[in-house]
Amino acid sequence: MVTSWYEKVQEFKSPIRVIAAVLLRSRETQAAKVCELSQRLAELESQLDQQQQHLQQQQQEIEALQQRVVEAERQRDQARQSVQLPEDPPLGTHGYGARMISLAVNLARSVGFRGAVRTLQVFFQWLGIDRAIPGRTSIRNWLQRLGIDEMKQPLDFSESLVIMVDHSNQIGTEKVMLALGVNAAAMPEPGNALTHEHLRVLEVKPGDSWKTADMEREYEALADQYGAPRAVLIDGAVELRDGAECLKKRREDMLVLRDFKHYAANVVKSLIGNDERFKEVGGKIGSTRSSIQQTELAHLTPPSPKQKARFMNLSGTLAWLTMTLWLLRTPEAKSRVGIREERMQEKLGWVAEYGDEIAVWQECQDLVSAAVTFINEQGLFQGASRELRAVIGDKLEHGTSQELAQRLIAFVAESEKPLREGERLPMSTEILESSFGLYKQLERQHSKSGFTSLLACLPALLKPTTPERVKVAFARTSAEDVTAWTEKHFPSTVTSRRHAAHAEHQSALKRATAEAGVL
């Protein structure tokens, strides 16, 4: 039996209007939920589309990177297979070309012979090239050939030639004379100091005797080969100065100039070298160095004293003294952390007792440094003393430094008098000392064995060589020339005599042992 909804409603306790309202609200609620879920579904579908697009983009980037990796590996493999050195036909019979020789020689100038060999080995291994590497003996011989050839070549500027001359010694009585040539007409612009490339090594020669007569002979030989110079620049040694006078017979306007820095050091020595307070400081620096170099004050250890040219190397000592004075007066300094006040005073407090003297010495050093820089960069010319006076200024506070300034200015004024209008000449041998330094760097630990045939390399150390230079030099100078030069200048060396002494002793010991056995 079918029951109508109207009849069914009659059974409900709630009125029909209430039931209708509930049903309507339920329908509205469900409709709202459906709408909300539809929106959420749309959002999720949008996010999914974005993620799919991002994933697709990443996949494309990965594919591109994979292609780049493949291409890089292909190029690497191709490079490994195709690395070739420039064409370099061999010179002579040793199998190495001018390019390889110049490369090895230039490396040796910087890192030594053994270092050059190791550098070449590392470089060729990195390139994946299997080829022969020249040995240190070959590189040494090449550098000697280049050096000897350099000294054999004529000059084209004898009219403006300035010769710098000095001696150097290492062990024993033997000294080496080094003569450098500078073209005064091609000096660097004012404000720039001479460099090694402005120099030519004219002669490097060992000898046991370098008296005035010996130097006269060497000056004459230099003039025969290169022409009479415009000037000879020396450090003030008597034999160098007096020996050069012979050149005035060849050229009346020849000048003998003294190195400014050596002169300044001599003046400083005369002003403060005999000061008892200065001597006391020197002694206390030595004892202080010994007492603190293995303590918590090790970072405040004074510099090692210079055994030679002490008054040319005061800057380091004075810098230490002024720093120590400041630390004593500045307890909060970071450099004093971890050092008790009583320890500071015990080991370094003595420096404060010389505060007034240190101020004088430091002003003298600052004056000398400024003057040396001026001479190095400007040279000697008419008016140099006037410009030097302007550089020094008139604010010196101490009588000692004021007297030093007067004497330095007077020295330059006297030296510039013979110069022609517009002429500029070097007045510093620092570049010569630096040239000796290049040789000592190459020589390294061998300096304890005295001078050897390695000296032949010195002329080739002043500037980098080129393949073209190697070809020309090797065509003129052979390995036999190196042997002849060595036999002439080094018939024996300290090392060879040392070996001979040991050999003689061993021979005598064997004879004595044999005779004792017979008895």
Residues covered by each model-derived region:
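Acidic, low-complexity intrinsically disordered segments
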Residues: 1-56
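RNase H-like nuclease fold core
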Residues: 18, 25, 71, 78, ...
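Acidic/histidine-rich catalytic cores and adjacent linkers
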Residues: 33-48, 52-65, 69, 237-247, ...
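Short, charged amphipathic recognition helices of the HTH superfamily
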Residues: 107-123
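Hydrophobic/aromatic interaction determinants used to assemble and anchor large protein complexes
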Residues: 281-282
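Structural motif
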Residues: 10-12, 92-96, 427-430, 449
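Eukaryotic helical DNA- and histone-tail-recognition domains of regulatory proteins
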Residues: 97-109
